[in-house]
Amino acid sequence: LKALGATDVLSLSAVGGLRADLPPGTFVVVDQFIDRTFAREKSFFGAGCVAHVSMAHPVCPRLGDHVQATLAGLGVPLVRGGTYLAMEGPQFSTLAESRMYRSWNCDVIGMTNMPEAKLAREAELCYASVSMVTDFDCWHPAHDAVTVDAIIRVLLGNADRARSLVTALTAPITTDP
């Protein structure tokens, strides 16, 4: 992306909510990540080249602010800030894992965003992530454990809002003749 001239990267992800106040349908503009993945390439560097990139603030505040303002303008229920737990998958969490992630104060859980957030930082790209809550993972006693059917049902409901977000964010972009 950097080689093609991209400066900003927006990620849209389906996630499980790890807090009762993040019901399905909520969009979360996350600002932190915990990487629990293990089977993915995690760096552009290697083969004798070492680089240490700070991940203290993995989300670009400028893009995060723009995303938040755009979602608010579209009337989408949103929360600004939160911690995204990236798990390897493809299996969903066990109840014990879900409880542990909640005890870590994670807000949402998903299988994407890592290594993307780290790679964007390495490439010096402005990165932001919108997590679209589709379920309560398996921790919530009043809700069934997550299923693919439930995720797809909520995602279909979020699709128009996600398209509206991307359209609104990219509308000001122009190309040089």
Residue ranges and their predicted role:
Residues 1-139, 145, 149-156, 160, ...:
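Glycine-rich phosphate- or other oxyanion-binding loops that anchor nucleotides, phosphorylated ligands
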